From Swiss-Prot:
This is HTH-type transcriptional repressor PurR. Residues 2-56 form the HTH lacI-type domain. Homodimer. GO terms for biological process: negative regulation of DNA-templated transcription; purine nucleotide biosynthetic process. The keyword Zinc does not apply.
Amino acid sequence: MATIKDVARMAGVSTTTVSHVINKTRFVAEATQKKVLAAVDDLNYAPSAVARSLKCNTTKTIGMLVTKSTNPFFAEVIHGVEEYCYNAGYTLILCNTEGNLVKQRDYLRMLAEKRVDGLLVMCSDIDQDLLDLLARKSDLPMVIMDWGPESPLTDKIQDNAEQGGYVATKHFIDNGHEKIGCLSGHSEKSTCRERLKGFNKAMAEAGITVNNNWIIDGDFECESAVEAANQYIAMKDRPTAIFCFNDIMAMALISTFEQAGVRVPDDISVIGYDNIDLAPYFSPPLTTIHQPKRRLGKTAIEILMERVKDKNHERRVFEMNPELVIRKSVKDLN
């Protein structure tokens, strides 16, 4: 089995230079990089992660807990994290918790056993049980990004959800809609309450009475949107516009409407939230509220890297300003 000395000898450089090229820890001239990487390929050299961790007290790995990586919002956040880790020479271990406390506990134990250098927690369901688990890992540098009230344990995502709800609803109103409904997320979550607050604020400013029958609780998943769509379809008095609290629910809602012969935007207008990658390519292209998901992931991992160097690095607030992206899913009634 080839060693780092064999690579250095073949490339005509020092073992230190080989180490810097492989670990991306210092600038090395491009020509030298090519020689080293060619030697690595020729010799089929693979550095020992165990030896490196013993020598340097680092595994060059980061653990990440997310609710569900198949959710397009989290998928795009993860993309930002993974891209940063790759460029920095780190390996990302991704753990889908599904909001399950047992899985959260087991994953935390596994990541601790693998001696990850840091932990990034970005779940939509951070509750006290999870915070208690994380508090027991206080020796591990971590960034906990939370959408809830400020906590001394967590970094805060300030997503200005009230403004997002207000902007979406006002766009409906500006296009002549008064019969406006909402397909919300988990009503116990602060970000959902804030979006609904923005919805109510825009309606009140316009002097429009809110019909509570048109406000339906979803759970950010497609199945809840299908159920909501069927409820709207069954109504004798339907809204002309529906504000969905994420794009996935908006798309499932539109699909169910179309199958029932209810056309979007001709019969009902729809606005989503998040501006996921698929939104411009849906039929019709979805008007939505943009959130900078990749930048959120990149910022979170940057904060974690700072905390790996200094565990007492101050808690941070990451602010996202919602922006309306106008496409083709809202009909102008003016």
